[in-house]
Design a protein with these regions (language model features):
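C-terminal regulatory/interaction module of P-loop NTP-utilizing enzymes
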Residues: 1-25, 30-182
Length: 182
């Protein structure tokens, strides 16, 4: 803040509900008085914190009543339509966008069975896009196992891999992803 000269902004604290028991009083002080030890958050700055629900992160600690009384909770759900707008603006791979257009139910899922967790997230799709484009650029092998590094559901990864292979095969001069492009 001092280096940039910004007089207002957002101080973002991620995974606030994973703070250790020893740091909890410091976080309470930060939330209540906008102070971290001897450092004060300047006027014009707000504190925004985020955390995942316990079912998605086993390191989550339930916040005590004093802390909860100082925060407002917004529950945010994954929305494929909103994400696709973001993804298009970020240049996410067209095969991913067209696949999700056809199969929006595969955008986000978390399944835990017999201590095995399978998940598909927005971060996974975006990371896949970044690496997929680079692999294509370098002519490297892309297969289902590659997809599973980012799409942590074997079923969805295999389905997307099949779609991707079909997309890479020109159909009448057009790729499937180009037919569904907006």
């Amino acid at each position: 803040m001092e280096q940039t000269g910004y007089r207002e902004g957002i101080l973002f604290l991620d995974e606030i509900n994973c703070v250790s028991e020893t740091l909890a009083p410091v976080m309470l002080q930060l939330l209540q008085f906008k102070k971290f030890g001897t450092h004060k958050v300047p006027e014009g700055w707000i504190i925004v914190a985020a955390g995942n629900p316990p079912e998605l992160n086993h390191a989550v600690r339930e916040m005590d009543m004093a802390s909860l009384d100082r925060v407002r909770t917004l529950n945010i759900e994954a929305d494929v339509t909103v994400w696709k707008q973001y993804a298009a603006s970020r240049g996410v791979h067209p095969a991913i966008l067209s696949y999700l257009e056809m199969k929006p139910e595969t955008f986000y899922r978390v399944v835990e069975e017999r201590k095995k967790k399978e998940f598909v997230t927005a971060r996974g799709w975006e990371d896949l896009s970044t690496v997929l484009k680079e692999y294509e650029h370098q002519g490297l092998d892309i297969n289902r196992y590659f997809m599973e590094e980012f799409i942590r559901s074997p079923e969805v990864a295999a389905d997307f891999d099949a779609y991707y292979r079909m997309d890479r095969t020109c159909m009448g001069g057009y790729r499937i992803s180009e037919l569904f492009a907006e």
